[in-house]
Regions:
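Reverse-transcriptase-like RNA-dependent polymerase core
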Residues: 60-79, 162, 166-172
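Short amphipathic beta-strand starts and helix->beta connectors
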Residues: 70-71, 121-123, 206-210
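N-terminal low-complexity, intrinsically disordered segments
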Residues: 43-58, 102-104, 108-109, 152-157
Length: 235
């Protein structure tokens, strides 16, 4: 569909949506959504989602139904001599994940305490708020991406108004492997921050009330303060 001012022009992939609600109600729904999310695509059903990717609905369903085969496992050497497992999406899956990352996930809010995977972010910037503090504590989240579940992704990123359960399920299915975020997928970093937003905000508020500085860079949580940090362990 194309939106110019208060005029909505529907395309062939919007046919089922328009038929279900009628042209006037469908246009009002689109304009209502666009007024709140001007930079995000309106995706109500599978046909619109396929059109968003520039593929057929049949091809979209095929990718989702065979998602395990759309990833190749690779191994990245680590400094300690061990290897990190990565799951690299196929070219055709990347054609779907790219627009999800650039057009949808980039518009969703993340916590101010999350410092990774954003424009201008770096480990150095993550460390800056902690400089000069007497006490420093670093905690690591084990199996960070693998611990973020299908349900968490669906609820945090794709469970919004005018996104049907069908589309939410399809988007989540494209972004997950084995019911979790695959490390190596282009959408996993952004999704991890989106899913962790509530956690980061809760921990951040708790720390602020106790004069503790908190930041999270991917799976590394850093706490610092001029006071003892014993309470962090208990939390």
């Amino acid at each position: 569909m194309k939106i110019e001012g208060s005029c909505v022009t529907f395309e062939p992939c919007d046919a089922a949506f328009v038929k279900k609600f009628g042209p006037l109600e469908a246009a009002n729904m689109v304009l209502d959504y666009h007024s709140v999310h001007p930079n995000m695509p309106f995706l109500y059903d599978a046909e619109q989602l396929a059109g968003f990717f520039g593929i057929s609905c049949g091809e979209l369903n095929h990718i989702v139904n065979h998602i395990q085969k759309e990833y190749k496992k690779a191994f990245l050497p680590k400094k300690d001599g061990t290897y990190r497992s990565l799951y690299i999406p196929s070219i055709r899956l990347q054609f779907c994940l790219g627009p999800i990352k650039d057009r949808i996930l980039s518009q969703l809010p993340v916590s101010k305490f999350a410092t990774a995977y954003q424009k201008g972010s770096s480990t150095r910037k993550n460390a800056e708020p902690h400089i000069g503090k007497k006490n420093l504590l670093k905690l690591d989240i084990t199996d960070f991406f693998g611990s973020i579940s299908f349900e968490q992704v669906l609820c945090a990123a794709f469970n919004t108004r005018y996104v049907s359960k069908q589309v939410g399920f399809l988007l989540t299915s494209l972004c997950c492997k084995n019911d979790a975020l695959p490390q190596g997928s282009p959408t996993s970093p952004a999704l991890s921050n989106i899913v962790m937003r509530r956690f980061d905000d809760q921990i951040g508020r708790w720390c602020n009330q106790r004069q503790i500085t908190y930041t999270r860079y991917c799976d590394d949580m850093t706490f610092s303060s001029d006071r003892p940090l014993y309470g962090v362990y208990q939390k």
